Amino acid sequence: TRTRVKTPRGDYDGTIRTVVDLITQLSDGAPSQPTVGVDMPGIIDPRTRTVKNSNATWIQGHTFQEDLEKALGRAVRVANDGNCFTIAEARDGAAAGAAVVFGATLGTGCGGGVVVNGVCLNGCNGIAGEWGHSPLPWADKTVRQGRPCFCGQKDCLEQYLSGGGLARTYRDIAGRKVKAKEISGLLAENDADAVRAIEIYEDRLARALAAIVNILDPDVIVLGGGVSNVERLYDNVPGLIGKYAFSDRFETPVVKAVHGDAGGVRGAAWLWSENEVDA
């Protein structure tokens, strides 16, 4: 069963109630009490157990997992949405069978996750895979310095590679606002400004992924999120990565997620699988 509800933005207690109501609704009629996995924007700090690095800023600083467990009266497993996405694609998705997988989510934000031999890496600080808050590498004159990010920095990858980042690039070129999802339609119409915006986007994405390749050298790179539905990315970005990666050849497959926008919730369900997360 799949159900969507709106998140009560700005209301932490309302968010907890909404999640509890959704879980209760989906649990009704189940032959046994199901396990509960939650994917969320941001991470649970391994030291304080509070939420940090979330663009859902109203949950920042709260003990989300413990509060949800108390409200439900049972154990819950929670992980970053980029990690959950990557777990799903590594387990039975586009990267099934690969030893080292990097998953990149290009949607409302710009997230990521790393799965090695079936285990999602969290890291000492709980931020493994958080590439979206690194600066754009090999920046050139096409970058307009000063795009502020909710994290307090400027010119994070998220400000260029998220859907909003793509829309802003289009606005810089065309002088008018459009939503990111409208750009695909403009590309189909061969709109010159949309074509230029996506060309710039592809080069920026290639630079960002090349930095990942230079450090991790994954066997597969999986793209998810709304922008990943732009099909030309898969034809153009791999060749561009080769310009920046520290290698005389680039052979890593860059593939589209097979689970679509269900990847995060599928990965959350996998959190109860033994040894799934390097906590």
Language-model features, listed with the residues they occupy:
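Residue-level structural signal for beta-strand termini and adjacent loop
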Residues: 4-5, 56-57, 126-127
